[in-house]
Regions:
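Short low-complexity, flexible loop/linker segments enriched in glycine and/or proline
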Residues: 339-343, 365, 387-389, 563-565
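A generic secondary-structure signal for well-formed alpha-helical elements
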Residues: 25, 176, 263, 291, ...
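Short, basic, helix/turn surface patches
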Residues: 133, 348-360, 399-406, 580-582
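Cysteine-centered catalytic environments shared across enzyme families
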Residues: 1-345, 357, 361, 542, ...
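Adenosyl-5′-phosphate
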Residues: 1-4, 78, 121, 174, ...
Length: 634
């Protein structure tokens, strides 16, 4: 696990400037650093830099940038690479590349050898989490590559025929000549969904490379494509269905065991996050089965009972016989992390579960350098409550159309009768846009986000959703979450929270073979109308008694309404003061000031009320924190 950055430019970016960009990511790689500049063609210079967190082959042989040896009829030093992540099948690939003169036991060198032999299509053979920058001197091309599901981040800035890239926004912001011009349309969408999805970023001309994406840069020309696309892979795998549940369970179990085993290969201490839920408990159980010693497990508990799951995690740990560590966190302990959010989430990010994720990462880092997580189980095996609601909404869609039609009749239109309907009925009656139906969000949220940022041109449609060509709302939303929410929110949250403490998080459920196999399963194996994550739960019950796992999920939550109207109130009032907003020149000062004042007086309606406005206010607050850290101080 590391951080990478670099450039391809005709400008005069010095080696000192490149090192400064690299050092903004010290937390991502405290063990080693490297920075080099190469002379390219047509007046271009190529700069590569990396911060290293040593996981495999802790020797100096793993230093980056790394260069190719003479092999396959190609001269040495013709290919250079910087790389963030892990290639879990590097051992298998190394055997296929046995005629390459390897000098290390690093997966980075396997990437170089694979590229020399197979070209850029070598990425199709790689199973892992990665962000790669590769420079081929023969063709004077630079390639940027991101893993299939977006576990590792990769930003890039294109301007004036030049390219600058980095694992985070910080190295781009540190690059000479960078302009911090905020995109208003992206800001409005952030307020609505609480994260910023690829390919967008908060800044103009800066983008995230999409999951499963490749960018080729050659003397100012850019070409992008996807080597792994959710929709295409889903339909391809659907052509090879597995019809028998027991057969599917056995094959999936085998794939999960192999995925966990490959993620336990490390030259540093390794453990597992454990919440006591299905996914983390199953990953921990398989890891324990695969380990000669008790696996180190970590969980945090909260003093407020409605948020606390530590007792469940402890029960599972005792049953499995792990080496368990837990820590109880009071509200003060969580609140103290709020100020550090913009430093490590260097783009506006408002999923408040980032705070407990940082806390459990800090706890784990005291004893290990690598931690397994259960991320991906909800998206690939139908675990979210939202999916239940979508199944209900699709059944009610005809009734929703009828209600919508009735409320539009002369004499009723404009009477605001929708506001008297239950929020679930409003969601299906008001939202008639076929490209927005799976979002199940009250239109009031959308209107509020648009009102916060005037003339933002906010459009909350996802262009890829119609391309799935799937009629079932539940399946379509699962695919959309894999494409957007999983990489943009969940994996971003885990990456930044773990990297804050130089901890590597690994997600076995997001193994390439597991993801692709999940697409071969009939949807009834995941959701049968009553039970979600059906097949994954069945595997978990092979390891852990059902009564330990079957309970309502609490999740990593924090008391936002209490914080915003309590200890954060003074800062929130400052950020929403009409004069301040007028000087800032981003938001509608009158509207936002009135909205926040009303919120502070009346509070939050709560989930399912249609007026759960603490989410938007928290997103506004975190943006202002970020703005103070990166824009106002500049």
């Amino acid at each position: 696990m590391c951080g990478i950055c670099g450039f391809v430019s005709r400008g005069d970016i010095s080696l000192e400037a490149l090192r400064g960009m690299n050092d903004t990511m010290y937390h991502r790689g405290p063990n080693d650093s490297g920075a080099e500049i190469y002379v390219g063609g047509d007046g271009y210079r190529v700069g590569f830099a990396q911060r290293r967190l040593s996981i495999m082959d802790l020797s100096e042989l793993g230093h980056q940038p790394m260069h190719s040896e003479a092999a396959f009829g190609v001269a040495g030093q013709c290919v250079s690479v910087v790389f963030n992540g892990e290639i879990y099948n590097f051992g298998e690939l190394k055997k296929e590349l046995s005629d390459y003169p390897f000098k290390s036991n690093c997966d980075t060198e396997v990437i170089i050898a694979a590229y020399l032999k197979w070209g850029i299509s070598c990425i199709d053979r790689m199973n892992g989490m990665f962000a790669i920058a590769l420079y081929d001197r023969r063709s004077d091309e630079v390639f940027l590559v991101r893993d299939r599901i977006g576990k590792k981040p990769l930003y890039y800035w294109i301007e004036g025929g030049n390219l600058v890239f980095g694992s985070e926004l910080k190295p781009l912001m540190a690059c000479p000549g960078f302009r911090k011009e905020i995109r208003r349309d992206v800001l409005a969408r952030f307020l609505y969904q609480q994260y910023i999805n690829a390919p967008d970023s908060i800044f103009k001309d800066v983008y995230k490379l999409e999951p499963g994406g490749v960018l080729r840069f050659h003397q100012g020309e850019v070409k992008k494509w996807k080597y792994w696309d959710i929709g295409r892979v889903y339909h391809r795998m659907q052509e090879r269905p597995v019809e028998d549940f027991d057969e599917a369970k056995g094959e999936l179990k085998g794939l999960l065991k192999r995925a966990v085993a490959s993620r336990m290969i490390a030259d540093v201490p390794l453990g597992s996050f454990l919440s006591g839920g299905y996914d983390s408990s199953l990953m921990t159980a398989i890891a324990q089965e695969n380990s000669a010693e008790p696996v180190k497990t970590f969980s945090i508990g909260f003093e407020e009972e409605r948020y606390d799951e530590a007792a469940y995690a402890r029960q599972v740990a005792e049953y499995l016989g792990t080496d368990h560590t837990e820590a109880y966190i009071d509200e003060k302990g969580m609140f103290e992390l709020v100020e550090s959010i913009p430093k490590y989430y260097d783009e506006p990010f408002a999923d408040s579960s980032q705070i407990p994720t940082m806390l459990v990462s800090a706890l784990a880092r005291e004893r290990v350098t690598v931690a397994l997580s259960g991320d991906g189980g909800d998206e690939f095996f139908c675990g979210y409550q939202m999916y239940d609601r979508l199944a209900q909404a699709q059944r009610l869609d005809g009734a929703g159309a009828f209600v919508h039609g009735v409320l539009g009749l002369p004499g009723l239109k404009g009477a605001k009768l929708e506001e008297r309907l239950p929020v679930k009925v409003r969601a299906v009656s008001e939202n008639r846009d076929p490209e927005l139906k799976t979002q199940m969000c009250p239109p009031a949220y959308l209107k509020t986000a648009m009102a916060f940022v005037p003339e933002s041109g906010l459009d909350c449609r996802y262009p890829q959703e119609s391309g799935y060509q799937v009629k079932d709302w539940q399946i379509r939303r699962m695919l959309l979450d894999m494409d957007t929410y999983l990489p943009g929110d969940i994996l971003c949250k885990v990456d930044r929270a773990s990297m804050k403490y130089s901890l590597e998080a690994r997600c076995p459920i997001l193994d390439k073979d597991v993801m692709e196999y999940s697409f071969r399963l009939p949807h009834s194996f995941k959701y049968d109308g009553k039970e979600k994550k059906r097949i994954l739960k069945s595997i978990a019950y092979d390891y852990i008694p059902r009564e330990m796992l079957d309970r309502k999920k609490k999740g990593f939550s924090v008391p936002l309404d209490k914080w915003l109207r309590g200890p954060l109130r003074e800062s929130l009032e400052t950020y929403s003061e009409k004069g301040f907003l007028g000087r800032q020149g981003i938001f509608d000062a009158d509207y936002v000031s009135r909205f926040v004042t009303r919120y502070l007086e009346q509070g939050d309606g709560g989930p399912g009320s249609g007026s759960n406005y603490s989410r938007i206010v928290w997103a506004f607050y975190t943006f202002q924190q970020w703005y103070a850290c990166y824009i106002r101080q500049a």
